[in-house]
Amino acid sequence: GLEEGVVTPGTHYPCSMGYHFGRNKLGCHAHKSPVDFEESIMMSCNAYYCYILRDLLENKKYSTIGVAMDRWQEYVKSFGFGQKLGSDFPSELGGFIPGSGYYNKVYGKGGWKATTVISLSIGQGEIGTTPLHMANLCATIANRGFYYIPHIIKDSENVRIEEKYKERHYTMVDTTHFPKVIGGMYRAVNSGFGSGGTASIAAVKGLDICGKTGTAQNPHGSDHSVFICFAPKDNPKIAVAAYVENGGFGATYAAPIASLLTEMYLNKEISEDRKYLEERMMNSNLMDRVKVRRR
């Protein structure tokens, strides 16, 4: 949205528990309204991203919604989505990012519009991705617009690291736009409880963790808890994606787990004031939320 000029850091959009279109609604949680760009990330406002996708797909600079849709697809794929990243992880999956061809096949050419695909704006709908893709997205944001192909071995005296793992892969989004995204992620974690930030539970003193919560809808049971983060804010050393099946809101399980991993990696220990959180995560059991299909 920033790259296309359909939104600026100062653009405000309203949110009344979601994005309303016709008799339908893509839901959101209660928070202040309206919100600007950074606040939308800080407060995890679904409606904000619905407005951005709508304005992108209905942008008059594109001759048809199909052309705009394919432009959106190009942007998303430039972050590594919808394809195998080429890592040395076993059984890597490529995922799926839909374009106009997909929707023309499903609905017929001219048979769909922005509201038909509005759930794409929050990473749902027909989007298929993996935790590796999400961790790579987080690393890309931390790097202000580029990523390295993920691989298992960071360094070794006896193993030569292939050159492809040292090459930078740049996105289609200019590096000047990433500080505002990072600002929102920083505020999501470090604004303090009661501020509206959805990831205050992930704050660790001195680490400047930047993160974004997510809740993946699950038609077969409790929603999945999702969180991505990197740290520190400047000169980052680690990026994490946590996905907890049936965990509910991102701040409930994924954010605590990811922040504990980040803290241990950077500090080599868990601080005393967060030991309770470590114990709670280690002793949690979500098996009662899993629906078993009987044959």
Where are these predicted regions, by residue range?
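Short amphipathic alpha-helical face segments that pack within enzyme cores
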Residues: 130-136, 253-261
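Short, gly/Ser/Thr-rich active-site loops of penicillin-recognizing serine hydrolases
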Residues: 160-164, 168-169, 257-295
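Beta-lactam-recognizing serine transpeptidase/beta-lactamase-like catalytic domain environment
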Residues: 1-247, 289-295
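Ordered, soluble secondary-structure elements with a strong preference for glycine-centered loop motifs
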Residues: 248-252
